[in-house]
């Protein structure tokens, strides 16, 4: 089973293995939320509107998750989910990205290709080797949004993350998005971490828009 961060990284790549443009400032919070979700599903943390607490300090065996688990366990301060999202995102999520991509490469799902011109490094692509995994992730999202069946809790959590960074528009047509909007709004309320990710990103975008409006032209 892939982690949420690995699934998000797959969805962030286009057909050429390049990263899609996403909403400004959202990727750090989405990846931070992805790790918190995996820790919650692994019964290492519990969340409620008031606080995020450690249930079990035992390492999961996944370095990406265990690094964040240790960070939370070492904290002397009690924080809620929103505060931890902002803390983890503020510290940067480069290591989360690196570990997620490394795992996908080691599993044979992606490969890493460096593009060079006259021996000068220009960019790195991550083309898909095994497209079945990405198709399965997208199919789960499609089934959860476009059917009347009760979604799996992991699929609800994933949809909340994908919705927060506006990736649904890269998966569905405008007509499908319009049809699924009531369902999306319903699922947003069913996962606390995903809901907080969406709120934090919306707040960031609101601040950016206000700053732009106040900037002299």
What are the roles of these predicted feature ranges?
Residues 56-98, 106, 119-158, 168:
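Short, amphipathic alpha-helical interaction segments positioned at domain boundaries
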Residues 36-39, 100-104, 157-166:
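Short, structured motif recognition centered on aromatic/hydrophobic residues
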Residues 49-52, 114-119:
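Short, Lys/Arg-rich nucleic-acid/phosphate-binding segment
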Residues 125-217:
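Glycine-rich, aromatic-bearing surface loops/beta-hairpins
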Residues 1-92, 199, 205-217:
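Short, amphipathic alpha-helical interface elements at domain boundaries
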Residues 105-114:
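Hydrophobic, aromatic-enriched interface-forming segments
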């Amino acid at each position: 089973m892939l982690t949420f961060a690995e699934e998000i990284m797959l969805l962030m790549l286009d057909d050429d293995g390049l990263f899609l443009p996403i909403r400004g400032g959202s990727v750090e919070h989405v990846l931070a939320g992805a790790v918190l979700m995996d820790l919650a599903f692994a019964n290492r943390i519990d969340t409620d509107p008031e606080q995020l607490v450690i249930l079990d300090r035992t390492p999961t065996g996944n370095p990406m998750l265990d690094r964040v688990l240790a960070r939370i366990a070492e904290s002397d301060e009690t924080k809620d989910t929103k505060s931890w999202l902002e803390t983890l995102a503020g510290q940067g999520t480069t290591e989360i990205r690196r570990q997620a991509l490394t795992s996908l490469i080691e599993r044979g799902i992606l490969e890493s290709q460096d593009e060079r011109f006259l021996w000068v490094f220009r960019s790195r692509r991550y083309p898909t080797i095994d497209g079945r995994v990405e198709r399965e992730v997208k199919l789960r999202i499609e089934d959860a949004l476009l059917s009347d069946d009760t979604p799996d809790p992991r699929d609800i959590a994933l949809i909340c993350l994908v919705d927060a960074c506006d990736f649904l528009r890269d998966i569905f047509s405008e007509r499908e998005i319009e049809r699924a909007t009531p369902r999306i709004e319903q699922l947003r309320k069913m996962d606390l971490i995903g809901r907080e990710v969406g709120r934090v990103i919306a707040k960031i975008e609101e601040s950016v828009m206000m700053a732009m409006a106040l900037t002299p032209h």
